[in-house]
């Protein structure tokens, strides 16, 4: 059988992982629970009039176990789960090629862990041809080829016409080995091999669960290797030699049906790997080796089963889920999901506004600022509520710019901007002067002076930074000798002193932000209610009304 391709220099940590390994891992955990000798599915040997059927269980027992242990109340859910497990080849019906489960007395058998899909089996057509050719040599009714198998055999014989003699010789050699096995052992291994091919070469009309979407295969990062890098290289890189490796797998496979429950009674502790050979070994070849190991006593060259098991656990079985390259991809997926969870939680913690509310806020902001936009409301037009001078860019007069200097009054538009925003007040030089006069009367003028000096510090030249830092500290921050100390709390003062250990243009940012918040929340509101601001508004309104009367009289 063609085994999974490995890198030429592959190590134990670089083995391939099937793109569906997470699904297989969950199924195998469930199957291992079913294989438990005490709490698992009851496996028994059924006696008939002339023969025995070893290591089987009924569909009723399986469905009952699923509903009991998985706490399912719906029979259809239990049947669906059983169908999924059977379709992936973890259990099979002993006398039918269709991998389904019925809730009746039909007998089923668990697949040996050696044939589990998590081992990344990729069987070739030559292996399938050997298997079908071997089936034709066995004169038994239950081993006769089905119609679709006979058609497949004819196609394969035509495909491999040049090397069909080699295929026939392999099938004949495997058939001779099978004849030396015990009857019950041969019966179990034949059914397991048939179930393996029912999964990888299913009956026409059934779903092939081993097919992987090429896009999914590419996303999983699984490389595509040439036929030169065979799985035998893995044995050379591991701690077990090639011969000992194949013997250990064969012995482990042969020990499975020797128990009372057959091959299904040994839970899968780790991911087994297929046996290796230079030309590719089929499942029947490994079964033949298993039969030889079972029927004959171990020789001096073959280590005991316990030693083999320990060696496998220390070597080949070390490549479990946690040490394979799939861990990197799984870790990336987990990190992505964790990041998404953090982002979603942050969204839940934020104040969420409805779209209609956001639109209302935008419309309100537009209506508030529209009168100040000269493109939407041209100055001097009928829509201008402030009756300002005409726009100097489209008229032959510059009165709009010279109005305050000529008349000595402040325009209503300018005062309205101060009222709408504290930022607009500070951005206007005349607004800062007016606010400074008010703060001086309130005995808190040092706050605005300190904030403005910090703004100048941020934009000054580099050679002036140490000088300005010293001046600002001596005038506003020094607790012992400051001429105009500002009111900052202890935490801000500690941060500022730490920043002054390495003076730069951002040393006073925390203190400036603190003072800015104080002025915006307290001083600005008192300024709008002060007599200074009210007098300015009253004078501007009188000027506007006088201009309107003159314009009406002139018209």
Curated annotation (Swiss-Prot):
* Keyword Nucleus attached: no
Q: Which CDD domains match?
A: DEP_RGS7-like, GGL, RGS_R7-like
Where on the tree of life does the source sit, at the highest rank?
Answer: Eukaryota
Q: Which Pfam families match?
A: DEP, G-gamma, RGS, RGS_DHEX
Query: Where are the stretches annotated Disordered?
Result: 253-307
UniProtKB keywords: Cell projection, Signal transduction inhibitor
The residue ranges of the G protein gamma domain are 330-395
Q: Which GO terms describe its cellular component?
A: cytoplasm; dendrite; neuron projection
Tell me where in this chain the DEP domain is found. Answer: 37-112
| Ranges of biased composition (kind: Polar residues) | 256-267
Q: How does it assemble?
A: Interacts with gpb-1 and gpb-2.
- Protein name per UniProt: Regulator of G-protein signaling egl-10
Originating organism: Caenorhabditis elegans
